[in-house]
Amino acid sequence: MAKVISIVNQKGGTGKSACTANLAVGLAQKNMKVLIVDADPQSDVSAGFGYRDCDESNETLTALMDTVMKDEDIPSECFIRHQAEGIDIICSNIGLAGTEVQLVNAMSREYVLKQILYGIKDQYDAIIIDCMPSLGMITINALAASDEVLIPVEASYLPIKGLQQLEKLDRTVDEIRRRFGYFSIQRAAMYQDKVLSH
């Protein structure tokens, strides 16, 4: 059964999507079967794997979550796109922002994503969720479905200073742990080589 890993940081531009893609490729190169769940309406990780048509598609995480909230059958397999690299992906689109609002009034709102993954976890070694830069209901869903949480942080002055804000995230995650079960948190420092031109 798959280990579910969420890539989370409430700040944008921290490398969550790059971390998601690189982790997925690295695991696939070790002959692991990997599913990426793009849980960010910006769809960067979907686009990074060549899916730039997601805003026009009905086969996205948005449609899957809407299906669960309507208490309809979950045809998860129909929403999974297969890559030659051995990485599958459930794409996102801009409609996920609307789903975030709908989740506020949904039954068992924290478990919608977990319910989606339940039926397909045994097909994968790892499921990696690329979260949006917020602690809204979609991210809460990702955390509730996760075994591990990875928080990418750029190793430079302002992001390191911003680690203080992660204390707030830690408190939120601790509350989610108490409500939904244990998962571990890892912080990853992202180093970027910069080339100065003369």
Label each region the model flagged.
Residues 1-167:
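P-loop NTP-binding core
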Residues 168-198:
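Acidic, metal-coordinating catalytic segment for phosphate/diphosphate chemistry
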